[in-house]
């Protein structure tokens, strides 16, 4: 019998693609899985052997929404089984620089979106911030500014951005037309739109802030108009009373031919920066 380079023994193998959830031996040859075998009666042997009794063996997890994009966080994620960490919500206005900083330095895979928020900040504000708190949040873009914002997004996709990222709750002054135009660019590059919607709660907040249902209707309409794929960046904990309604809206949109996904974070509360537009007057 051929000696394997690596034998992972007795682990609970979970593979969503094949619907496998069972105790198995896994053999690796030349860096690739060469055999998966039931443990009973197995005679597999490896040059290196790992006893994974009581542990789960699975494909690496892909985290679509990871703001911890530094070496320390990558190491922690690797220990949690994450093999790819992507910053697809906020993203960056300079894809080349973002990738250059991490090249050949990380223990896991990484990727970034061409971000609407940082594009707005780069065009409309002086200096850098993760979340806008001045003009990029609270002022409509002038014609020339909008042209530059959209060009920044387009260049980011040309340079390897994996998606177009939006944080609409953080840029309440961004017009519906501005967002539709950015969706059009995503469609042009066959890139998905990863969108933190304008409002998360229900019923709608006081003033001009939208609730979760109205906000999801907006981005689904954008996807319908442009044909862009859409990922709704979480069904939020502050909209628990309408969670079933939101999921039904997404499901029915997909049944009608759209390409929409969503997720939720595994906590009962969210977090953000106190200077963000979420805490504008009337936020309570």
Could you tell me what each predicted segment is?
Residues 60-67:
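Metallo-beta-lactamase
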Residues 67-69, 90-91, 115-119, 169-171, ...:
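Active-site beta-loop-alpha junctions enriched in small/polar residues
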Residues 146, 155-216:
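Divalent metal-binding pocket/active-site signature
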Residues 102, 106, 118, 125-130, ...:
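Polyanionic/metal-chelating signatures
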Residues 74, 95, 175-178, 203-220, ...:
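Histidine/acidic-residue-rich catalytic or RNA/ligand-binding cores of hydrolases
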């Amino acid at each position: 019998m051929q000696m394997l380079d690596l034998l992972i023994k007795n682990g609970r193998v979970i593979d969503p693609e094949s619907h496998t959830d069972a105790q198995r031996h896994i053999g690796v040859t030349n860096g690739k899985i060469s055999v998966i075998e039931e443990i009973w009666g197995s005679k597999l042997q490896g040059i290196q052997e790992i006893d994974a009794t009581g542990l789960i063996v699975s494909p690496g997890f892909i985290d679509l929404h990871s703001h911890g994009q530094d070496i320390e966080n990558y190491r922690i994620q690797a220990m949690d089984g994450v093999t790819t960490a992507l910053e697809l919500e906020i993203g960056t206005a300079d894809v080349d620089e973002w990738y250059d900083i991490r090249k050949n330095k990380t223990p896991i895979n990484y990727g970034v979106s061409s971000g609407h928020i940082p594009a707005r900040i780069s065009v409309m504000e002086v200096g850098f911030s993760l979340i806008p708190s001045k003009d990029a949040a609270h002022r409509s873009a002038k014609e020339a500014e909008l042209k530059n914002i959209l060009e920044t997004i387009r260049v980011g996709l040309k340079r390897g951005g994996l998606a177009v990222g939006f944080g609409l709750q953080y840029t309440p002054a961004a017009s519906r037309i501005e967002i539709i135009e950015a969706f059009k660019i995503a469609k042009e590059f066959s890139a998905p739109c990863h969108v933190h919607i304008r409002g998360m709660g229900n019923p709608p907040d006081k003033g001009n802030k939208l609730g979760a249902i109205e906000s999801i209707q907006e981005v689904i309409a954008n996807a319908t108009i442009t044909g862009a794929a859409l990922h709704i960046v979480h069904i939020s904990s502050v909209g628990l009373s309408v969670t079933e309604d939101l999921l039904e809206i997404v499901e029915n949109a997909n049944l009608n031919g759209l390409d929409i996904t969503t997720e939720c974070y595994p906590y009962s509360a969210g977090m953000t920066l106190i200077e963000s537009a979420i805490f504008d007057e009337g936020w309570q």
